[in-house]
Amino acid sequence: MRTDFTDDTTWAQTLAAVIASYREDTITGLTPVNDAAFDRLTLDALGELIHDQTYVFLADATTMTDPEHPLLAVDTSDESSHGNYPMLRLAPSVMAEVEVNLFLANTDFADFADTVDDDGVYRGLNR
């Protein structure tokens, strides 16, 4: 979900990198959302919008300004954590690895969070 609309070129590059991380036959639950109604969406407001979603990936201001364009992964599985969700950053190139494993429940959010690099970005297990 795009929440920063300051740079259309960076958005297009980031989305292309995300899509490229998937193989053609990959089973996924990912739906890119590019709607200016979500510009500057806060995590509190996010909680009001998502129902029955266990995770959300955001292209926020950091995504648009950091040269690596790390997306913000938000674990929304615990409704009681409204606004205080567990989060991690991930490189667009590992989106399929993270999203598909969460979608299929092969791995949980904490497993990925436990393996982020020192800068808080998950870049994959096989680097």
Which stretches of residues belong to each language-model region?
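Short linear, low-complexity motifs centered on an aromatic residue
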Residues: 115-127
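Short helix/strand-capping turn motifs
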Residues: 1-110, 125-126
